[in-house]
Design a protein with these regions (language model features):
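C-terminal transmembrane helical hairpin of 12-TM major facilitator-type secondary transporters
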Residues: 263-307
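Helix-to-loop junctions at the C-terminal end of transmembrane segments
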Residues: 57-70, 150, 154, 249-261, ...
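Intrinsic disorder in cytosolic terminal tails and internal cytosolic loops
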Residues: 1-3, 183-191, 315, 374-415
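Structural signature of the two symmetry-related core transmembrane helices
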Residues: 72-86, 165, 264-279, 361
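Intracellular juxtamembrane helix-capping segments at the cytosolic ends
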Residues: 110-123, 303-317
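C-terminal membrane-cytosol helix-exit motif in multi-pass small-molecule transporters
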Residues: 150-151, 165-185, 367-375
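Helix-loop boundary and gating motifs at the non-cytosolic
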Residues: 2-51, 203, 215-224, 228, ...
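Cytoplasmic helix-loop-helix junction between adjacent transmembrane helices
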Residues: 102-137
């Protein structure tokens, strides 16, 4: 049994190092930038640049992988990520960092597409669910481990940037020494907005707005923590627990949505996330434990929304179209993450650190309002015609290639 999973474990080891490096680097940069006196606008633009680079990578990386092959392409992406991480430690300048974050987003998209296509090819119809579950587990654990590492050293020193570079280099070893056959060439990415909207207006608008909220929080959450005066260790724990809380709540919320109209569950979670955001804005908590508890409650609701939206879209998708629909929604989510950091930074600059939650609350309130409007205009999908809910990571942008690994994908879609 374990022999069949050996090549998958090798890929997952590389994934773990890659995500740990990404998690650490993504948290380290805003903390160091805040300590260096970077403007809020610049810190927000770093998140926008990363998202723009990631989306561009989703479109362009397949061409590069076809030319160089999976192993060489992944090695190139990981090496570039390491060089960029070390470069951000050498050159402390907000303009340089914004440009380098765009490059990081691009190479991370390419690296994820290679790994996800490789995992998809190694998975069979019988073990696809297990492989997908392992991938989700590694994703959450690695990001959390990377983020918690930031508390082990002074963010003002270069040592953490070196650790990021080492982790990126370690990620390329499992694929570089692998003797397994490389997968089929990556497929080009396309985005049919009209067809996506016709399939599910709620999922279309929802995924974009979820990207706005998650992009704002993911980029500026650490800046919010630093400005209200909580410690680096508390910031790392806060950012990690938001992700973990969302992962834990996804299954019970998903099961409820399997038994009723998913849109009611989506609207309820969006309202809850908006209310918690409003409470944080008004209460202006400054105690570390209180802030961590409130943001964990926020994450538990906010980070279930993406999986609910994708599940709702899949309920309406015709047989064999899940990968295309899910891939399109991932790109919409990515476009949303370009907007969120700029919106959050503008509000934080105009008012106070807690204004970050005005940006997230506005996005979540818009999701709830539009979902409730659509409930009146379109009947729900009968229970017997729905696909079962599956958890999805909403703490980072995914790639359309990863949608083919989801067990809901039909065999012909993964071909």
């Amino acid at each position: 049994m374990f022999a069949a999973y050996r090549p998958i474990f090798s890929l997952l080891r590389g994934t773990a190092f890659l995500l740990a490096a990404s998690g650490l680097h993504g948290l380290l940069l805003p903390l160091r930038g805040q300590a260096e006196g970077f403007s809020t606008a610049a810190l927000g633009l770093m998140g926008t640049a990363w998202a723009a680079g990631f989306v561009a990578g989703c479109y362009l990386a397949p061409h590069l992988v076809r030319r160089a092959g999976h192993v060489r392409a992944f090695g190139t992406f990981a090496a570039c990520a390491a060089i960029i991480a070390l470069g951000t430690g050498l050159v402390i300048d907000e303009i340089v960092w914004i440009a380098l974050r765009a490059c990081t987003g691009f190479v991370m998209a390419g690296a994820f597409m290679v790994i996800e296509s490789w995992l998809n090819e190694k998975a069979t119809n019988e073990n696809r669910g297990t492989v997908f579950g392992l991938y989700m587990m590694v994703t959450y654990a690695s990001i959390m481990a990377g983020q918690m590492t930031v508390a082990l050293a002074d963010v003002g020193q270069a040592s953490l940037f070196m650790v990021v570079g080492i982790l990126f280099c370690l990620s390329l070893i499992p694929t570089a020494v692998s003797t397994q056959a490389t997968p089929q060439p990556l497929q080009n990415v396309s985005l049919d907005l009209r067809r996506l909207y016709a399939n599910s207006p709620v999922a279309f608008a929802g995924c974009f707005l979820i990207g706005v909220a998650n992009g704002a929080w993911g980029t500026l959450g650490a800046v919010y923590g630093a400005r209200i005066g909580i410690s680096t260790a508390e910031i790392a724990l806060m950012m990690s627990l938001v992700v973990v809380a969302g992962a834990v709540l996804q299954m019970p919320v998903g099961r409820i949505s399997d038994r009723t109209d998913r849109r009611y569950v989506l609207a309820a979670c969006a309202v809850g996330a908006a209310l918690i955001g409003g409470i944080v804005f008004l209460a202006t908590p400054r105690t570390g434990s209180y802030v961590i508890a409130m943001t964990a409650a926020y994450g538990a609701l906010a980070y279930t929304l993406y999986s609910l939206a994708v599940a709702h879209a899949n309920d309406h998708a015709s047989a064999g179209e899940f990968a295309k629909v899910s891939g399109g929604l991932l790109l919409l989510y990515g476009y949303g993450t370009m907007v969120g950091p700029v919106l959050g930074a503008a509000l934080m600059s105009a008012m106070r650190p807690e204004s970050l939650f005005l940006a997230t609350a506005a996005a979540h309130a818009a999701i709830a309002a539009y979902t409730l409007l659509r409930i009146r205009r379109r009947a729900p999908v009968p229970r017997e015609e729905r696909e079962a809910f599956k958890t999805l990571p909403a703490d980072r942008a995914g790639t359309p290639q990863g949608a083919r690994l989801d067990p809901r994908t039909r065999p012909q879609e993964g071909a």
